């Protein structure tokens, strides 16, 4: 199949993505501050990893839709502000080690649990629609403005977000 990849960077850079894992399907993308939109061939069950030449890559938008993956590792993408992994079939995700991550979209996956405590003070928008979550605690996310968590199997949802203006549950 195919899926959509959207990338954006503060300054020109090259991003390498191993779509299958094991270094067998590595593709390079030249990214600038203009949105880079690509249709990519998907590899179901792949363990996707993203790499950059710079230690602190200037990539700040990483967005996929319909790219099926077993796993994705974004830990080295320390400048990411927006991560969108929609309709990927993910049961787990390794998020960036970033103090800048403000928007996280993980809709239409197979997540049963997710620990976002690392990002509690920085997330502004979070979307976890159409997963398999049974409980979620957003009470420590004091800066969260929008939470979309509809179409899960929620039995428990904890909120204490004084500035939240949008809730879809």
Place the predicted regions along the sequence by residue.
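Short intrinsically disordered, low-complexity coil segments enriched in acidic
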Residues: 1-5, 142, 150, 166-169
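N-terminal capping/linker segments that flank leucine-rich repeat
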Residues: 1-82, 89, 99
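Extracytoplasmic low-complexity repetitive segments enriched in small/polar residues
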Residues: 29-34, 59-62, 83-85, 104, ...
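Hydrophobic loop/turn residues within beta-sheet-rich immunoglobulin-like superfamily modules
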Residues: 43, 53-55, 75-77, 95-98, ...
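Conserved hydrophobic position(s) of the canonical leucine-rich repeat
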Residues: 59, 69, 80, 90, ...
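Consensus "Asn ladder" position of solenoid repeat domains
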Residues: 67, 88, 106-109, 128-131, ...
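Canonical leucine-rich repeat
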Residues: 70-72, 93, 114-116, 136, ...
